[in-house]
Each structure stands twice: as C-alpha cells, then as structure tokens.
C-alpha cells in the first residue's frame, strides 16, 4: 500500500479523484494479471502447440540429458493438470483485480481526506487476503479456496462501493464563455 500511496502522491497530485483512484486499481490489478497469469499461459499455449504438432521432440533433442529430464517432468505435470485449474487462474485474477481496485480507493481516500484509518484498512485487508490464501491453500481444495476469495471480494466490493457512492463527486466545471 505504500507503493500506491507514493504513486498517488507523486504522479497523481493534480488528478487525484475517486474515478482516477479506481483506474489506478484497474491498472495495478491488470498489469499484475498480465505479468503473473498472462505470460505463464502464453508459455503454456506455446508448449501445447508444440506437443500437439509433434515439434516438441525436436526441441527436446537439443537439450542435455539433465535439462531434458527436467523438461519432460515439467511437461508431464502440465499435461496431467486438470483443465479446470487453468480456468481457476482466471477466477483468481478477477478477485485480485477487484481487490486492487478497492485497495486503491481506500488509499486514495486516506490521502485525499487525511483519513489514515482507510490506509490501515487497506494494509490489513491486503494482509488478510494474502494470509488466508496461504493458510487455506494447504488444507482447502483450490475450487473452494477461489470461491471463498470470490465471496470475500464481493463483500469488500460492496462495502467499498458504498464508500465510493457516499463521496461527493466534484461539480463539473462551467464552460467558459467564448
């Protein structure tokens, strides 16, 4: 959250509005989605194409024995992964983007109005989601975990949207006479 705070202070001084805070969250969550899931799935897609076209053998043939064995082991894991798990990454990213939008609004609110409790709420919320994910991942099936996180994010979005709607929007500037 300190990164959000610094970015808003440094780069959004003149444009710090509640709407821009939401867009900051969309950008933050979106780039994280691209960097974490997007690039991985492009790699998975390229690998699947190589396997399905039969060109994987030629690629494996260029590797030394140890690297080839490790690559074959990775391919086996990829090929035996249940297909719904690839879908679950998308569900997880939806929750993550919603979280980043909400966190960005809370940090904006703390900065814009000096309401430090919203900054601490953002920090606590981010910690709680990350901690719950780590703790539950070892004991709860992935589908249940993602549904729990999705439900939690729905509640967070509802609460933050109430704050957002309660905040007055600035009056539109009057057109200057020509």
Per-segment meaning from a language model:
Residues 1-11, 24-25, 36-40, 104-108, ...:
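Generic transmembrane alpha-helix signature in multi-pass membrane proteins
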Residues 3, 37, 41-45, 78-83, ...:
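Juxtamembrane/disordered regions of integral membrane proteins
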Residues 10-19, 112-116:
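Juxtamembrane helix-boundary/capping and inter-helix hinge elements in multi-pass membrane proteins
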Residues 22-32, 123-127:
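Transmembrane helix-bundle signature of multi-pass membrane transporters/permeases
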Residues 26-70:
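Transmembrane alpha-helix/helix-exit interface in multi-pass inner-membrane proteins
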Residues 70-102:
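Alpha-helix-centered segments that form part of catalytic cores
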Residues 89, 93-163:
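Functionally important transmembrane alpha-helices
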Residues 158-174:
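Membrane-interface capping segments at transmembrane-helix boundaries
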């Amino acid at each position: 959250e300190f990164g959000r705070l610094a970015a808003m202070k440094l780069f959004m001084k003149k444009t710090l509005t509640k709407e821009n805070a939401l867009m900051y969250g969309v950008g933050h969550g979106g780039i994280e989605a691209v960097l974490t899931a997007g690039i991985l799935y492009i790699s998975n897609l390229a690998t699947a194409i190589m396997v399905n076209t039969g060109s994987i053998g030629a690629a494996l043939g260029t590797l030394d024995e140890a690297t080839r064995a490790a690559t074959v082991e990775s391919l086996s894991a990829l090929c035996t992964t249940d297909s719904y798990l690839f879908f679950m990454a998308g569900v997880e990213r939806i929750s993550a983007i919603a979280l980043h939008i909400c966190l960005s609004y809370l940090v904006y609110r703390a900065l814009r109005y000096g309401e430090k409790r919203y900054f601490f709420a953002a920090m606590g919320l981010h910690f709680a989601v990350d901690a719950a994910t780590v703790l539950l991942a070892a004991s709860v099936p992935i589908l249940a975990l993602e549904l729990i996180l999705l439900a939690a994010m729905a509640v967070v979005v509802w609460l933050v949207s109430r704050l957002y709607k309660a905040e007055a929007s600035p009056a539109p500037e009057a057109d200057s006479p020509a």
